[in-house]
Amino acid sequence: DRRRKLPVTTIFYSLYSKETEEKIAELKKQGKRIDPSEITGMSKEEILSYFYDIDHVEKLKKGWKVAFEPARVKGVKFPFDLVDADTNKVVWEKDKKLTVRSAQKLVDKGLKSFLVDDNYLYGKFLAKALVIAKTGEVIADAGAELNEELLTAINEAKIKELDLLYIDNVNVGPYIRNTLEADRNTNREEALGDIFKVMRPGEPVTLEASEAIFKMLFFDEERYDLSSVGRV
């Protein structure tokens, strides 16, 4: 039933954030319960970091410094000379295929990172929101795709470090990231409300009722107390 379908990320938004889980655990030790107003759901950044490895890149005078990972470059032909970010020396010629063995040899010789220009970053996605420290202005949200316009804004803002999602479109796809972009919800309350509307169409939406439905669907021990042959 298409009317009952929701983006899977709506469920993730509805789950407790790591901060909330830690707070609940600490209060439990003290025999206390968390105030509902203190509960937060998973954020977009938290969801992305759960499903993707994060690559850190740093802006230097001659380009962006990217970590060299031998396991990721098997069969890769870089369209540019591979330049060691520490020595500025060419360590591998462009359009020459790398093997796991040759990549490991480069590491054994001391290669830790290499230099790339802005073009290399086009099409990659931010793991965290970009905020200008002095003004607090958010110039891009987590999950945003890097393009020429955004890279120009990043360079003009003198942002020197970026955290990017590792997506190679072979072993790791952009599916969760794309689903987050399509999800109209942005926080726990909105997500719980959407789930409630699907399960109880026409009924008035309240946070308490939405939480009750969500817990019943996914966390009711009696509902999911299955025997070895299923529910009896």
Regions found by a protein language model. Name each.
Residues 1-232:
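N-terminal non-catalytic structural scaffold regions of very large proteins
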